[in-house]
Amino acid sequence: MYAVIKTGGQQFRVEQGTTLKIEKLEIESGKKVTFKEVLMVADGDNVRVGTPFVPKVTVEAKIISQGKEKKVHILKFRRRKHSMKQQGHRQLFTEIEIVKIKA
């Protein structure tokens, strides 16, 4: 059985036991979180697609850790002006493990 959930403006295909990194959630490590925005659920040949969400279906996950991604370097170079701007960004993420898909 697998499901497609929506969180942080992105969609993820998840199964029980799947570990993935999503946009940062303001929840402590070790706590549980429930995703109610389930776009699709499939169990063998039985596929249910929501409009936009499947009713009465939730996905439970456990927060494993919080962290930052690797740094992305941004360089803006102005030709012939002897000028450049350098900047870095580290995106915050939450690592979760899918515990259960309630369908």
UniProtKB/Swiss-Prot annotation:
**Sorted UniProt keywords:** Ribonucleoprotein, Ribosomal protein, RNA-binding, rRNA-binding
Task: Describe, as the record does, how this protein assembles with itself and its partners.
Answer: Part of the 50S ribosomal subunit. Contacts protein L20.
- Function summary: This protein binds to 23S rRNA in the presence of protein L20.
Q: Does the keyword tRNA-binding apply?
A: no
Entry GO terms, CC: cytoplasm; ribonucleoprotein complex; ribosome
Q: Which GO terms describe its molecular function?
A: rRNA binding; structural constituent of ribosome
Q: Does the keyword Coiled coil apply?
A: no
Q: GO biological process: any one?
A: translation
Under which name does UniProt file this protein? Large ribosomal subunit protein bL21
Family classification: Belongs to the bacterial ribosomal protein bL21 family.
| PANTHER family given in the database record | 50S RIBOSOMAL PROTEIN L21 (PTHR21349), LARGE RIBOSOMAL SUBUNIT PROTEIN BL21M (PTHR21349:SF0)
